[in-house]
Amino acid sequence: MKDTVSQPAGGRGATAPRPADAASPSCGSSPSADSLSVVLAGGGTAGHVEPAMAVADALVALDPRVRITALGTPRGLETRLVPQRGYHLELITAVPMPRKPGGDLARLPSRVWRAVREARDVLDDVDADVVVGFGGYVALPAYLAARGLPLPPRRRRRIPVVIHEANARAGLANRVGAHTADRVLSAVPDSGLRRAEVVGVPVRASIAALDRAVLRAEARAHFGFPDDARVLLVFGGSQGAVSLNRAVSGAAADLAAAGVCVLHAHGPQNVLELRRRAQGDPPYVAVPYLDRMELAYAAADLVICRAGAMTVAEVSAVGLPAIYVPLPIGNGEQRLNALPVVNAGGGMVVADAALTPELVARQVAGLLTDPARLAAMTAAAARVGHRDAAGQVARAALAVATGAGARTTT
């Protein structure tokens, strides 16, 4: 049976999951004739959850009466991230998706049936007007439930679906769902989804609205950098990245000699081995994680980072040039994520195996001491970045939910 992370009166907030045998509470504020119910299906990784939360915020900004329900699984980051953002979360059985068609895909119907039933119960409980899916473990059951599968004893009810694909190479759940979705949106062209409209990746409002120039002095003071510093920002995701840590920390002496300040988020499980700072060296600020990314972006002139969809979206949205180091596993999607920015001139790609202290020192010093080239890369990154992706997805969802004939019962 599905679980729920319930909310207090007023339609938002979260408490502990209810017992599995408890009755489902009403989700969001009380339904009314003029309030729309939107179910956001995106769980598992931050790359699925964060765009969903950005769209939730955009929906509420467009229509404060909208009722938001996030659909997730017990194993995903949504169990922490969704309640933190103040939205209601319903949990269903996780259905891991195979990367490629084959035997696992052939056995998928037996695995997914329970999750589809649970998803359908959620859609009925909240009287859903539209499902917005972001891929991942929870998306396919939501798409199938919204399609109106004839699961007795209830009548079929089709709910419109909007799909957003954040990666350059669409995952299996979104490839399946796109065949019958009402609208298909993607981060980049050529994602593998037909009819896809390119909107970028939804990012948090604090990032989308960031004016780096206005916030720069405050941001640099926050981290202890001089106003006129040349600042390199390094991060490898929520857990850091060992290869980035080694390469950049190994280049610390050369970076200091070039007058480069460093803000380095190395990950809570990692430890940096740094040389003792010499008198007169620019600051090298090493932290386990950054909880104010807007300040980090505002302080920086250049970034070294991975190339996950959310990372590329945020870095390009704020107009930061970057050295992208794709994760050297998977099917190469991280490199594909970075290519639109790189091809536009807003960054470069360096293979993980090629990232050495010598390369870091040479490339970073070369860029940060060449104002004309850095300015050109900054402008290119800003041109290709998408600041209003969350708003575009939210507007598409509301349009589909209110469209004539969008919702039918047979």
Curated annotation (Swiss-Prot):
Residues in coiled coil: none
Pathway in which the depicted protein is active: Cell wall biogenesis; peptidoglycan biosynthesis
A GO BP entry: lipid glycosylation
Feature: compositional bias, Low complexity: 14-34
Catalytic activities: di-trans,octa-cis-undecaprenyl diphospho-N-acetyl-alpha-D-muramoyl-L-alanyl-D-glutamyl-meso-2,6-diaminopimeloyl-D-alanyl-D-alanine + UDP-N-acetyl-alpha-D-glucosamine = di-trans,octa-cis-undecaprenyl diphospho-[N-acetyl-alpha-D-glucosaminyl-(1->4)]-N-acetyl-alpha-D-muramoyl-L-alanyl-D-glutamyl-meso-2,6-diaminopimeloyl-D-alanyl-D-alanine + UDP + H(+)
GO cellular component terms given for this protein: plasma membrane
Membrane topology annotation: Peripheral membrane protein
UniProt: UDP-N-acetyl-alpha-D-glucosamine binding residues: T45, A46, G47, N167, R204, S238, Q334
Region (Disordered): 1-34
Gene Ontology molecular function: any one: undecaprenyldiphospho-muramoylpentapeptide beta-N-acetylglucosaminyltransferase activity
EC numbers on record: 2.4.1.227
CDD domains from the UniProt entry: GT28_MurG
Key words, A-Z: Cell cycle, Cell division, Cell membrane, Cell shape, Cell wall biogenesis/degradation, Glycosyltransferase, Membrane, Peptidoglycan synthesis, Transferase
A Pfam cross-reference name: Glyco_tran_28_C
Main subcellular location: membrane
Location relative to the cell: Cell membrane
NCBIfam families associated with the record: murG (TIGR01133)
Family: Belongs to the glycosyltransferase 28 family. MurG subfamily.
PANTHER family per the UniProt record, alphabetical: GLYCOSYLTRANSFERASE (PTHR21015:SF22), UDP-N-ACETYLGLUCOSAMINE--N-ACETYLMURAMYL-(PENTAPEPTIDE) PYROPHOSPHORYL-UNDECAPRENOL N-ACETYLGLUCOSAMINE TRANSFERASE 1 (PTHR21015)
HAMAP family from the UniProt entry: MurG
Protein name according to UniProt: UDP-N-acetylglucosamine--N-acetylmuramyl-(pentapeptide) pyrophosphoryl-undecaprenol N-acetylglucosamine transferase
Organism: Mycobacterium bovis (strain ATCC BAA-935 / AF2122/97)
Gene that encodes it: murG
